[in-house]
Design a protein with these regions (language model features):
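Non-catalytic regulatory/interaction regions at protein termini and inter-domain linkers
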Residues: 1-202
Length: 202
């Protein structure tokens, strides 16, 4: 006899598994304001994802992109973006066009900024992008810094502080290594998933 005693649905039912290109297109085609979570299996997959996304948004959509890596250095991100099928002229977009910003996640999340000031700086980034004639901003931030600092509850609080939908021309893309996501409790996972408009696994 099948008795429903109110257990929640499995978490994976709320997460869409896609290949890298489809996942990138899903995020790219979402409206400004979207708050997305992307869980990635390894660095190679992540690099392919952000390389595809950055090329499309910078070259085709006239957007400013901020990448906030944790499991690789700023220079290794530049190297990944300048090589492979989806390569771009990193120096041109980073220095000349001011469309690419790469900031280490420990600096962004544990530097001088608080959670509140980090959000304020994102709003300022959108304002500056608009003044340059850009369509908007995408921020791809790796949440690994919180796990490195053993501040899991702080990570959940940070996610819940951010709006589920931004009221500015920005896409917030929270990147989670699968092993970091696995460290969250079931309740924490559910809160984080529910707070994002789109949850993807690549």
């Amino acid at each position: 006899m099948d008795i429903n005693i109110g257990y929640p649905m499995p978490l994976d039912d709320n997460i869409l598994t896609e290949d890298v290109e489809n996942a990138s297109n899903t995020v790219s085609e979402s409206d400004y304001g979207s708050h997305t979570m992307v869980i990635y299996q390894d660095l190679d997959i992540l690099r392919e994802f952000y390389s595809y996304y950055v090329k499309k948004r910078i070259e085709e959509r006239n957007e400013v992109i901020q990448i906030v890596p944790f499991y690789e250095t700023e220079d290794s991100v530049r190297k990944s973006l300048s090589e492979g099928h989806f390569s771009i002229d990193v120096e041109k977009w980073e220095k000349d066009k001011k469309s690419l910003i790469i900031v280490d996640s420990l600096e962004k999340y544990y530097g001088d900024e608080t959670v509140e000031s980090s959000y304020i700086s994102s709003r300022k980034l959108v304002k500056d992008a608009k003044m340059m004639g850009k369509s908007g901003v995408s921020v791809l931030g790796d949440m690994g810094a919180f796990h490195y600092k053993h501040r899991i509850q702080e990570l959940v609080d940070y996610e819940l502080f951010l709006p589920s939908h931004y009221d500015i021309d920005m896409k917030g893309i929270c990147l989670y290594h699968q092993k970091d996501f696995n460290r969250l409790s079931v309740g924490q996972k559910q809160k984080v998933i529910d707070h994002h408009e789109i949850s993807l696994k690549i």
